[in-house]
Amino acid sequence: MGRGKIEIKRIENSTNRQVTFSKRRAGILKKAREIGVLCDAEVGVVIFSSAGKLSDYCTPKTTSVFPPLSRILEKYQTNSGKILWDEKHKSLSAEIDRVKKENDNMQIELRHMKGEDLNSLQPKELIAIEEALNNGQANLRDKMMDHWRMHKRNEKMLEDEHKMLAFRVHQQEVELSGGIRELELGYHHDDRDFAASMPFTFRVQPSHPNLQQEK
């Protein structure tokens, strides 16, 4: 017995709907890859889930400088005559292409600066790279000297602050020791003044031998 025909309608159960979506999406993307490889066809598939999650596939073309999806959409627009984006989007696309090309050129220059891919360059281009490297080395040396001078200046400032703090601590120690001596001298001086001001009878002990003889 053959399988019964499945009615195509929205699946109400969210879990079953998600499972079916995952299976069908995987099948579509697999078929897109297969037809691209087997038939050397350009295929572009864009799928959005009900939650807005994107799944896409485009047959890669290593000879093209444009992103695969942009290339396919541009080709579709040219062949179908349908306008997929307005002048604003065209301008944005052109800006993206310009930035991408500029980035590619910078990557090439960076490889040249690192000594890579130099075989295809002319002597004039090699001289320009050498001058750029020399200028970069000079700028780097100047920057390092600036950092060294700043480090020495900060080191001198810290040394001066340390000397100032040491001087203040020493000054406080001197003032503190001088104050202690003044207190000690004042204490002895007060003792002498107190003894001198006492009456004679209080300053002589009654048990003194001379006093006993006088009695």
From Swiss-Prot:
A cellular-component GO term for this protein: nucleus
Keyword Oxidoreductase: no
Pfam families (alphabetical): K-box (PF01486), SRF-TF (PF00319)
PROSITE patterns found in the cross-reference section: K_BOX, MADS_BOX_2
GO terms assigned for molecular function: DNA-binding transcription factor activity, RNA polymerase II-specific; protein dimerization activity; RNA polymerase II cis-regulatory region sequence-specific DNA binding
Places the protein is found: Nucleus
Protein name in the entry: MADS-box transcription factor 4
Organism per entry: Oryza sativa subsp. japonica
Gene: MADS4
